[in-house]
Design a protein with these regions (language model features):
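Short helix-loop capping/hinge motifs at secondary-structure junctions, enriched
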Residues: 7-27
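Short, flexible loop/turn elements at secondary-structure junctions
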Residues: 5-7, 35, 60-62, 125-129, ...
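Generic recognition of flexible, low-complexity loop/linker segments
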Residues: 17-18, 107-114, 164-174
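Periplasmic binding protein-like
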Residues: 146-179
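Append "and occasionally in soluble cytosolic enzymes with long acidic Gly/Pro-rich linkers
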Residues: 21-148
């Protein structure tokens, strides 16, 4: 998931609420340490949804450095995940805290309220208009956000584009997140 730090509204004005929120480290850590994507992954792999988990930007076996070391193992080591392996039950990044972000959420809400951010923060995700599969998947993603972060903190809003994600959404920065 890629976060947009300069989101704009449909009139081209900066979305100060989102932009201030996403600039806050505790807010971003809530996304990273708190969102359980298991049901979202199940849209792709119903039997073993956590096989879809990817915390390393690429999948294992794709990239190697000049010493022959596999890229994802190097990243896992840097992230402190080098001792972690697929267990089929819990996403790797949720294991340390069990997905409990109550303290981070409280910290983020206090820090952000102090600078004028209002809650819930709206996170905009766009799908192609008329694509029922994309809508079903986005609805599951919205539920993951709701169950993991709470509707009092962040609400995922699903928007649509007609023909070009790049031209209609990404280029004009309407999105909060891209996948």
């Amino acid at each position: 998931m890629h976060l947009n730090f300069q989101r704009k509204d449909e009139n081209g004005n900066l979305d100060e609420n989102w932009n201030k929120a996403v600039a806050n480290r505790a807010f971003r850590q809530c996304f990273y340490k708190g969102i359980d994507f298991t049901n979202y992954y199940a849209r792709t792999n119903k039997i073993n949804p956590l096989k879809c988990e990817n915390d390393y930007y690429t999948m294992p076996g794709v990239c190697y450095n000049t010493k022959g070391e596999e890229y994802t193992t190097l990243v896992a080591k840097e992230m402190g995940f080098d001792g972690q392996a697929y267990d089929g039950k819990t996403m790797i990044r949720l294991r340390d805290n069990g997905g409990d972000i109550a303290d981070l959420k409280k910290q983020a809400m206090e820090e952000l309220s102090a600078i004028g951010v209002t809650f819930p923060v709206h996170c905009y995700h766009y799908i192609k208009s008329g694509d029922t599969t994309a809508l079903d998947t986005a609805t599951v993603l919205k539920q993951c956000f709701s169950e993991s972060l709470g509707d009092d903190f962040v609400v995922l809003d699903i928007g649509t584009y007609v023909s070009s994600l790049y031209k209609e959404v990404r280029n004009v920065q309407l999105h909060s997140i891209l996948q």
